[in-house]
Amino acid sequence: MSHKPAHLLLVDDDPGLLKLLGLRLTSEGYSVVTAESGAEGLRVLNREKVDLVISDLRMDEMDGMQLFAEIQKVQPGMPVIILTAHGSIPDAVAATQQGVFSFLTKPVDKDALYQAIDDALEQSAPATDERWREAIVTRSPLMLRLLEQARLVAQSDVSVLINGQSGTGKEIFAQAIHNASPRNSKPFIAINCGALPEQLLESELFGHARGAFTGAVSNREGLFQAAEGGTLFLDEIGDMPAPLQVKLLRVLQERKVRPLGSNRDIDINVRIISATHRDLPKAMARGEFREDLYYRLNVVSLKIPALAERTEDIPLLANHLLRQAAERHKPFVRAFSTDAMKRLMTASWPGNVRQLVNVIEQCVALTSSPVISDALVEQALEGENTALPTFVEARNQFELNYLRKLLQITKGNVTHAARMAGRNRTEFYKLLSRHELDANDFKE
Protein backbone atom coordinates (compact mmCIF):
# COMPACT_ATOMS: atom_id res chain seq x y z
CA MET A 1 0.00 0.00 0.00
CA SER A 2 1.29 3.47 -0.89
CA HIS A 3 0.80 6.14 1.77
CA LYS A 4 0.97 9.92 1.69
CA PRO A 5 4.20 11.14 3.39
CA ALA A 6 3.22 12.46 6.82
CA HIS A 7 4.63 13.18 10.27
CA LEU A 8 2.75 11.28 12.99
CA LEU A 9 2.76 11.76 16.78
CA LEU A 10 2.20 8.55 18.77
CA VAL A 11 1.19 8.85 22.44
CA ASP A 12 1.08 5.81 24.77
CA ASP A 13 2.30 5.26 28.34
CA ASP A 14 3.43 1.71 27.45
CA PRO A 15 7.00 2.13 26.04
CA GLY A 16 7.00 -1.35 24.50
CA LEU A 17 3.77 -0.87 22.56
CA LEU A 18 4.85 2.65 21.61
CA LYS A 19 8.10 1.35 20.12
CA LEU A 20 6.36 -1.49 18.29
CA LEU A 21 3.75 0.77 16.71
CA GLY A 22 6.42 3.33 15.84
CA LEU A 23 8.52 0.72 14.02
CA ARG A 24 5.48 -0.57 12.14
CA LEU A 25 4.48 2.90 10.93
CA THR A 26 8.07 3.89 10.08
CA SER A 27 8.36 0.77 7.92
CA GLU A 28 5.28 1.98 6.02
CA GLY A 29 7.03 5.22 5.14
CA TYR A 30 5.60 7.52 7.78
CA SER A 31 7.79 9.85 9.83
CA VAL A 32 7.12 9.20 13.52
CA VAL A 33 7.72 11.01 16.82
CA THR A 34 6.65 9.43 20.12
CA ALA A 35 5.56 10.60 23.58
CA GLU A 36 4.96 8.52 26.72
CA SER A 37 2.33 10.83 28.21
CA GLY A 38 -0.29 13.33 27.16
CA ALA A 39 1.74 16.21 28.61
CA GLU A 40 4.81 15.16 26.63
CA GLY A 41 2.65 14.87 23.52
CA LEU A 42 1.51 18.48 23.91
CA ARG A 43 5.14 19.59 24.25
CA VAL A 44 5.94 17.81 20.98
CA LEU A 45 3.07 19.61 19.25
CA ASN A 46 4.44 22.94 20.45
CA ARG A 47 7.83 22.36 18.86
CA GLU A 48 7.11 20.27 15.74
CA LYS A 49 4.75 20.33 12.78
CA VAL A 50 2.62 17.19 13.11
CA ASP A 51 0.02 15.96 10.60
CA LEU A 52 -1.82 13.43 12.79
CA VAL A 53 -1.95 12.23 16.42
CA ILE A 54 -2.52 8.59 17.40
CA SER A 55 -3.11 8.19 21.14
CA ASP A 56 -3.94 5.42 23.57
CA LEU A 57 -7.19 6.00 25.45
CA ARG A 58 -6.25 4.92 28.99
CA MET A 59 -3.17 6.70 30.33
CA ASP A 60 -2.27 8.03 33.77
CA GLU A 61 -2.79 11.75 34.53
CA MET A 62 -4.18 12.64 31.09
CA ASP A 63 -6.16 10.08 29.09
CA GLY A 64 -6.64 10.07 25.32
CA MET A 65 -9.90 12.03 25.34
CA GLN A 66 -8.45 14.68 27.66
CA LEU A 67 -5.44 14.92 25.36
CA PHE A 68 -7.78 15.30 22.39
CA ALA A 69 -9.55 18.19 24.12
CA GLU A 70 -6.23 19.94 24.86
CA ILE A 71 -5.04 19.44 21.29
CA GLN A 72 -8.17 21.08 19.90
CA LYS A 73 -7.47 24.14 22.07
CA VAL A 74 -4.00 24.69 20.60
CA GLN A 75 -4.44 23.17 17.12
CA PRO A 76 -8.13 23.07 16.16
CA GLY A 77 -8.82 20.54 13.44
CA MET A 78 -5.77 18.37 14.16
CA PRO A 79 -6.93 14.80 13.34
CA VAL A 80 -6.70 12.38 16.27
CA ILE A 81 -7.08 8.59 16.22
CA ILE A 82 -7.76 6.91 19.58
CA LEU A 83 -6.63 3.33 20.29
CA THR A 84 -7.98 1.31 23.21
CA ALA A 85 -8.05 -2.23 24.51
CA HIS A 86 -11.29 -1.49 26.37
CA GLY A 87 -13.44 -0.02 23.65
CA SER A 88 -17.18 -0.26 23.28
CA ILE A 89 -19.67 1.01 20.74
CA PRO A 90 -20.95 3.78 23.09
CA ASP A 91 -17.34 4.87 23.72
CA ALA A 92 -16.66 5.02 19.98
CA VAL A 93 -19.85 6.96 19.29
CA ALA A 94 -19.11 9.44 22.08
CA ALA A 95 -15.54 9.95 20.87
CA THR A 96 -16.51 10.55 17.25
CA GLN A 97 -19.30 12.92 18.32
CA GLN A 98 -16.69 15.00 20.12
CA GLY A 99 -14.57 15.15 16.98
CA VAL A 100 -12.15 12.22 17.28
CA PHE A 101 -11.49 11.05 13.74
CA SER A 102 -11.41 7.32 14.45
CA PHE A 103 -11.73 5.03 17.47
CA LEU A 104 -9.95 1.67 17.01
CA THR A 105 -9.84 -1.32 19.34
CA LYS A 106 -6.58 -3.08 20.23
CA PRO A 107 -5.08 -5.27 18.92
CA VAL A 108 -5.45 -3.01 15.92
CA ASP A 109 -5.77 -4.54 12.48
CA LYS A 110 -2.88 -2.99 10.56
CA ASP A 111 -4.86 -2.46 7.35
CA ALA A 112 -7.66 -0.77 9.29
CA LEU A 113 -5.11 1.49 10.98
CA TYR A 114 -3.38 2.41 7.71
CA GLN A 115 -6.74 3.14 6.09
CA ALA A 116 -7.79 5.31 9.04
CA ILE A 117 -4.51 7.25 8.83
CA ASP A 118 -4.84 7.81 5.09
CA ASP A 119 -8.49 8.86 5.44
CA ALA A 120 -7.65 11.26 8.27
CA LEU A 121 -4.83 12.86 6.32
CA GLU A 122 -7.00 13.17 3.22
CA GLN A 123 -9.95 14.74 5.02
CA SER A 124 -7.84 17.05 7.16
CA ALA A 125 -5.90 18.45 4.20
CA PRO A 126 -6.18 22.23 3.92
CA ALA A 127 -8.91 23.59 1.71
CA THR A 128 -6.32 25.02 -0.65
CA ASP A 129 -5.05 22.49 -3.17
CA GLU A 130 -1.56 21.38 -2.14
CA ARG A 131 -0.90 19.31 -5.26
CA TRP A 132 1.30 22.10 -6.60
CA ARG A 133 4.09 21.02 -4.20
CA GLU A 134 3.44 17.27 -3.98
CA ALA A 135 6.87 16.44 -5.48
CA ILE A 136 8.61 18.24 -2.59
CA VAL A 137 8.72 15.92 0.41
CA THR A 138 9.62 17.87 3.54
CA ARG A 139 8.75 18.69 7.14
CA SER A 140 11.74 20.99 7.65
CA PRO A 141 10.63 24.39 9.02
CA LEU A 142 13.24 25.97 6.73
CA MET A 143 11.76 24.31 3.64
CA LEU A 144 8.16 24.93 4.70
CA ARG A 145 8.88 28.67 5.03
CA LEU A 146 10.51 28.60 1.60
CA LEU A 147 7.49 26.84 0.12
CA GLU A 148 5.21 29.49 1.58
CA GLN A 149 7.35 32.18 -0.09
CA ALA A 150 7.18 30.20 -3.35
CA ARG A 151 3.39 29.95 -3.11
CA LEU A 152 3.09 33.70 -2.63
CA VAL A 153 5.48 34.64 -5.42
CA ALA A 154 3.74 32.20 -7.77
CA GLN A 155 0.69 34.47 -7.85
CA SER A 156 2.61 37.22 -9.65
CA ASP A 157 4.63 37.15 -12.86
CA VAL A 158 7.92 38.43 -11.44
CA SER A 159 11.15 36.69 -12.39
CA VAL A 160 12.52 34.30 -9.76
CA LEU A 161 16.15 33.28 -9.24
CA ILE A 162 16.64 30.02 -7.34
CA ASN A 163 20.01 29.48 -5.69
CA GLY A 164 21.24 26.19 -4.32
CA GLN A 165 23.91 23.54 -4.51
CA SER A 166 23.79 20.92 -7.25
CA GLY A 167 21.27 18.22 -6.45
CA THR A 168 19.07 20.25 -4.08
CA GLY A 169 16.07 20.10 -6.42
CA LYS A 170 16.01 23.54 -8.02
CA GLU A 171 14.05 22.35 -11.06
CA ILE A 172 11.43 20.61 -8.89
CA PHE A 173 11.06 23.86 -6.94
CA ALA A 174 10.65 25.84 -10.16
CA GLN A 175 8.01 23.35 -11.31
CA ALA A 176 6.17 23.82 -8.00
CA ILE A 177 6.09 27.61 -8.51
CA HIS A 178 4.67 27.07 -11.99
CA ASN A 179 2.08 24.61 -10.63
CA ALA A 180 0.89 27.16 -8.05
CA SER A 181 0.69 29.98 -10.59
CA PRO A 182 -2.16 31.09 -12.87
CA ARG A 183 -0.01 29.76 -15.73
CA ASN A 184 -0.22 26.14 -14.53
CA SER A 185 -2.36 24.98 -17.46
CA LYS A 186 0.31 26.14 -19.91
CA PRO A 187 3.74 24.54 -20.59
CA PHE A 188 6.61 24.34 -18.13
CA ILE A 189 9.81 23.96 -20.16
CA ALA A 190 13.31 23.55 -18.72
CA ILE A 191 16.74 23.90 -20.31
CA ASN A 192 20.23 23.62 -18.84
CA CYS A 193 22.16 26.66 -20.05
CA GLY A 194 25.52 25.07 -19.23
CA ALA A 195 25.02 21.80 -21.08
CA LEU A 196 24.91 23.05 -24.69
CA PRO A 197 27.41 24.82 -26.97
CA GLU A 198 26.65 28.49 -27.55
CA GLN A 199 25.12 28.26 -31.04
CA LEU A 200 22.99 25.25 -30.16
CA LEU A 201 21.78 26.94 -26.96
CA GLU A 202 20.90 30.08 -28.93
CA SER A 203 18.92 28.03 -31.45
CA GLU A 204 17.15 26.09 -28.67
CA LEU A 205 16.10 29.26 -26.86
CA PHE A 206 15.23 31.58 -29.72
CA GLY A 207 14.57 29.22 -32.62
CA HIS A 208 16.02 29.58 -36.10
CA ALA A 209 15.01 30.29 -39.67
CA ARG A 210 15.72 27.96 -42.55
CA GLY A 211 19.31 28.40 -43.72
CA ALA A 212 20.43 30.18 -40.54
CA PHE A 213 23.35 27.74 -40.28
CA THR A 214 24.52 24.46 -41.75
CA GLY A 215 21.86 21.87 -41.05
CA ALA A 216 19.03 24.37 -40.54
CA VAL A 217 16.83 22.88 -43.27
CA SER A 218 13.56 24.32 -41.96
CA ASN A 219 12.16 26.97 -39.64
CA ARG A 220 12.13 25.88 -36.00
CA GLU A 221 10.50 27.61 -33.05
CA GLY A 222 12.56 28.06 -29.91
CA LEU A 223 11.71 27.31 -26.31
CA PHE A 224 10.47 30.84 -25.66
CA GLN A 225 7.76 30.21 -28.24
CA ALA A 226 7.14 26.64 -27.07
CA ALA A 227 6.56 27.92 -23.53
CA GLU A 228 4.05 30.56 -24.67
CA GLY A 229 1.69 31.42 -21.83
CA GLY A 230 3.65 29.25 -19.41
CA THR A 231 7.03 29.17 -17.71
CA LEU A 232 10.56 28.82 -19.08
CA PHE A 233 13.06 27.50 -16.56
CA LEU A 234 16.67 28.49 -17.28
CA ASP A 235 18.78 26.11 -15.22
CA GLU A 236 22.44 26.93 -14.53
CA ILE A 237 21.96 30.46 -15.84
CA GLY A 238 25.39 31.33 -14.44
CA ASP A 239 26.97 29.22 -17.19
CA MET A 240 25.26 31.07 -20.05
CA PRO A 241 27.84 32.46 -22.54
CA ALA A 242 28.24 36.25 -22.48
CA PRO A 243 26.87 36.88 -26.03
CA LEU A 244 23.66 35.04 -25.14
CA GLN A 245 23.33 37.02 -21.92
CA VAL A 246 22.97 40.14 -24.07
CA LYS A 247 20.28 38.52 -26.23
CA LEU A 248 18.41 37.20 -23.20
CA LEU A 249 18.42 40.67 -21.63
CA ARG A 250 16.89 42.10 -24.82
CA VAL A 251 14.15 39.46 -24.75
CA LEU A 252 13.32 40.23 -21.11
CA GLN A 253 13.24 43.97 -21.78
CA GLU A 254 11.18 43.89 -24.97
CA ARG A 255 9.16 40.70 -24.47
CA LYS A 256 10.03 39.78 -28.04
CA VAL A 257 12.24 37.07 -29.49
CA ARG A 258 14.02 36.99 -32.84
CA PRO A 259 14.93 33.55 -34.23
CA LEU A 260 18.45 32.99 -35.56
CA GLY A 261 18.69 34.05 -39.20
CA SER A 262 15.40 35.95 -39.09
CA ASN A 263 14.68 39.68 -39.22
CA ARG A 264 11.24 39.30 -37.66
CA ASP A 265 10.48 39.77 -33.96
CA ILE A 266 7.87 37.54 -32.31
CA ASP A 267 5.89 38.67 -29.26
CA ILE A 268 6.15 36.32 -26.28
CA ASN A 269 4.25 35.88 -23.04
CA VAL A 270 6.47 33.74 -20.81
CA ARG A 271 7.36 33.75 -17.13
CA ILE A 272 11.09 33.27 -16.43
CA ILE A 273 12.43 31.25 -13.53
CA SER A 274 16.18 30.73 -13.46
CA ALA A 275 18.53 28.81 -11.20
CA THR A 276 22.23 28.51 -10.47
CA HIS A 277 24.66 26.91 -8.06
CA ARG A 278 27.14 29.74 -8.72
CA ASP A 279 27.70 32.89 -6.69
CA LEU A 280 26.45 35.36 -9.31
CA PRO A 281 27.54 38.54 -7.47
CA LYS A 282 31.11 37.19 -7.56
CA ALA A 283 30.67 36.29 -11.23
CA MET A 284 29.54 39.88 -11.89
CA ALA A 285 32.60 41.23 -10.08
CA ARG A 286 34.78 39.09 -12.37
CA GLY A 287 32.95 40.36 -15.45
CA GLU A 288 31.46 36.95 -16.24
CA PHE A 289 27.81 37.79 -15.67
CA ARG A 290 25.98 40.95 -16.67
CA GLU A 291 24.77 43.09 -13.80
CA ASP A 292 21.71 44.35 -15.71
CA LEU A 293 20.67 40.79 -16.54
CA TYR A 294 21.18 39.71 -12.93
CA TYR A 295 18.74 42.32 -11.65
CA ARG A 296 16.21 41.40 -14.33
CA LEU A 297 16.33 37.75 -13.26
CA ASN A 298 16.66 38.32 -9.52
CA VAL A 299 13.43 40.17 -8.75
CA VAL A 300 12.75 37.51 -6.10
CA SER A 301 15.52 35.24 -4.82
CA LEU A 302 14.91 31.85 -3.20
CA LYS A 303 17.74 29.80 -1.71
CA ILE A 304 17.21 26.06 -1.32
CA PRO A 305 19.11 24.64 1.67
CA ALA A 306 21.50 21.74 1.26
CA LEU A 307 20.28 18.37 2.50
CA ALA A 308 22.84 18.59 5.32
CA GLU A 309 20.99 21.71 6.55
CA ARG A 310 17.68 19.85 6.86
CA THR A 311 18.59 16.44 8.21
CA GLU A 312 15.11 16.10 9.75
CA ASP A 313 13.91 15.48 6.18
CA ILE A 314 16.23 12.51 5.58
CA PRO A 315 13.99 9.78 7.13
CA LEU A 316 10.94 11.19 5.35
CA LEU A 317 12.75 11.47 2.01
CA ALA A 318 14.51 8.12 2.37
CA ASN A 319 11.29 6.23 3.08
CA HIS A 320 9.46 8.06 0.28
CA LEU A 321 12.23 7.31 -2.23
CA LEU A 322 12.51 3.71 -1.03
CA ARG A 323 8.80 3.21 -1.59
CA GLN A 324 9.07 4.61 -5.13
CA ALA A 325 12.13 2.51 -6.01
CA ALA A 326 10.60 -0.64 -4.53
CA GLU A 327 7.38 -0.17 -6.51
CA ARG A 328 9.41 0.08 -9.73
CA HIS A 329 11.87 -2.74 -9.10
CA LYS A 330 11.32 -4.92 -6.00
CA PRO A 331 7.94 -4.58 -4.27
CA PHE A 332 9.04 -6.86 -1.42
CA VAL A 333 11.51 -4.24 -0.13
CA ARG A 334 9.84 -2.53 2.82
CA ALA A 335 12.18 -0.56 5.09
CA PHE A 336 15.64 0.43 6.30
CA SER A 337 17.20 -1.18 9.34
CA THR A 338 17.68 1.12 12.32
CA ASP A 339 21.46 1.25 11.74
CA ALA A 340 20.96 1.89 8.02
CA MET A 341 18.75 4.89 8.77
CA LYS A 342 21.30 6.18 11.28
CA ARG A 343 23.99 6.00 8.59
CA LEU A 344 21.77 7.91 6.16
CA MET A 345 21.16 10.54 8.85
CA THR A 346 24.87 11.06 9.56
CA ALA A 347 26.19 11.03 5.97
CA SER A 348 27.49 14.35 4.62
CA TRP A 349 25.48 14.33 1.35
CA PRO A 350 27.63 16.59 -0.85
CA GLY A 351 25.38 15.61 -3.76
CA ASN A 352 22.24 16.47 -1.78
CA VAL A 353 18.88 14.88 -2.68
CA ARG A 354 20.18 13.68 -6.05
CA GLN A 355 22.84 11.65 -4.24
CA LEU A 356 20.26 10.29 -1.79
CA VAL A 357 18.15 9.12 -4.74
CA ASN A 358 21.16 7.33 -6.26
CA VAL A 359 22.11 5.66 -2.97
CA ILE A 360 18.59 4.33 -2.43
CA GLU A 361 18.27 3.13 -6.03
CA GLN A 362 21.54 1.20 -5.56
CA CYS A 363 20.36 -0.30 -2.28
CA VAL A 364 17.09 -1.51 -3.80
CA ALA A 365 18.90 -2.92 -6.83
CA LEU A 366 21.36 -4.90 -4.70
CA THR A 367 19.19 -6.13 -1.83
CA SER A 368 17.58 -9.56 -1.57
CA SER A 369 15.97 -8.74 1.78
CA PRO A 370 12.82 -6.76 2.65
CA VAL A 371 14.97 -4.62 4.96
CA ILE A 372 17.85 -2.50 3.63
CA SER A 373 20.90 -3.24 5.79
CA ASP A 374 23.49 -0.83 7.16
CA ALA A 375 26.22 -2.64 5.19
CA LEU A 376 24.34 -2.07 1.94
CA VAL A 377 23.91 1.65 2.64
CA GLU A 378 27.61 1.90 3.51
CA GLN A 379 28.52 0.18 0.23
CA ALA A 380 26.26 2.48 -1.78
CA LEU A 381 27.70 5.59 -0.11
CA GLU A 382 31.24 4.44 -0.85
CA GLY A 383 30.23 3.86 -4.47
CA GLU A 384 28.86 7.39 -4.65
CA ASN A 385 32.28 8.75 -3.73
CA THR A 386 33.56 7.45 -7.08
CA ALA A 387 30.43 8.19 -9.10
CA LEU A 388 30.55 10.08 -12.41
CA PRO A 389 30.24 13.86 -12.13
CA THR A 390 27.51 15.75 -13.95
CA PHE A 391 28.23 17.03 -17.47
CA VAL A 392 28.72 20.60 -16.23
CA GLU A 393 31.02 19.47 -13.41
CA ALA A 394 33.07 17.36 -15.83
CA ARG A 395 33.33 20.24 -18.30
CA ASN A 396 34.43 22.67 -15.61
CA GLN A 397 37.07 20.24 -14.38
CA PHE A 398 38.31 19.75 -17.94
CA GLU A 399 38.54 23.53 -18.44
CA LEU A 400 40.50 23.93 -15.20
CA ASN A 401 42.96 21.16 -16.08
CA TYR A 402 43.30 22.44 -19.67
CA LEU A 403 44.03 26.02 -18.56
CA ARG A 404 46.59 24.87 -16.01
CA LYS A 405 48.35 22.81 -18.68
CA LEU A 406 48.38 25.74 -21.13
CA LEU A 407 49.86 28.07 -18.51
CA GLN A 408 52.48 25.49 -17.59
CA ILE A 409 53.48 25.05 -21.25
CA THR A 410 53.60 28.80 -21.93
CA LYS A 411 55.15 29.59 -18.52
CA GLY A 412 52.31 32.00 -17.74
CA ASN A 413 52.40 33.89 -21.07
CA VAL A 414 48.72 34.80 -21.51
CA THR A 415 49.07 35.97 -25.13
CA HIS A 416 50.72 32.71 -26.16
CA ALA A 417 48.27 30.59 -24.13
CA ALA A 418 45.23 32.39 -25.57
CA ARG A 419 46.56 31.87 -29.11
CA MET A 420 47.03 28.14 -28.46
CA ALA A 421 43.48 27.92 -27.09
CA GLY A 422 42.01 29.80 -30.06
CA ARG A 423 40.69 32.60 -27.86
CA ASN A 424 41.39 36.32 -27.67
CA ARG A 425 43.08 37.72 -24.56
CA THR A 426 39.87 39.14 -23.10
CA GLU A 427 38.04 35.81 -23.34
CA PHE A 428 41.07 33.98 -21.98
CA TYR A 429 41.36 36.29 -18.97
CA LYS A 430 37.66 35.67 -18.22
CA LEU A 431 38.30 31.93 -18.29
CA LEU A 432 41.21 32.34 -15.90
CA SER A 433 39.08 34.49 -13.62
CA ARG A 434 36.22 31.98 -13.62
CA HIS A 435 38.59 29.24 -12.47
CA GLU A 436 40.46 31.59 -10.11
CA LEU A 437 43.80 31.06 -11.87
CA ASP A 438 46.61 33.63 -11.85
CA ALA A 439 49.02 33.46 -14.80
CA ASN A 440 51.78 34.92 -12.60
CA ASP A 441 51.79 31.72 -10.57
CA PHE A 442 53.09 29.86 -13.63
CA LYS A 443 55.91 32.25 -14.55
CA GLU A 444 59.47 31.15 -13.90
Swiss-Prot record:
Main subcellular location of this protein, as a coarse class: cytoplasm
Assigned keywords, A-Z: ATP-binding, Cytoplasm, DNA-binding, Nucleotide-binding, Phosphoprotein, Transcription, Transcription regulation, Two-component regulatory system
4-aspartylphosphate sites (modified residues): 56
InterPro entries for this protein: AAA+_ATPase, CheY-like_superfamily, Homeodomain-like_sf, P-loop_NTPase, Sig_transdc_resp-reg_receiver, Sigma_54_int, Sigma_54_int_dom_ATP-bd_1, Sigma_54_int_dom_ATP-bd_2
Positions of the DNA-binding region: 414-433
Gene3D superfamilies per record: 1.10.8.60, 3.40.50.2300, Homeodomain-like, P-loop containing nucleotide triphosphate hydrolases
Annotated positions binding ATP: 164-171, 227-236
Residue ranges constituting the Sigma-54 factor interaction domain according to the UniProt record: 136-366
Post-translational modification: Phosphorylated by GlrK.
GO MF, one example: ATP binding
Entry's Gene Ontology cellular component terms: cytoplasm; protein-DNA complex
Phosphoprotein found in the keyword field: yes
Its job: Member of the two-component regulatory system GlrR/GlrK that up-regulates transcription of the glmY sRNA when cells enter the stationary growth phase. Regulates glmY transcription by binding to three conserved sites in the purL-glmY intergenic region.
General remark: Not required for the regulation of the glmY-glmZ-glmS regulatory cascade by glucosamine-6-phosphate depletion.
Name of this protein: Transcriptional regulatory protein GlrR
Organism: Escherichia coli (strain K12)
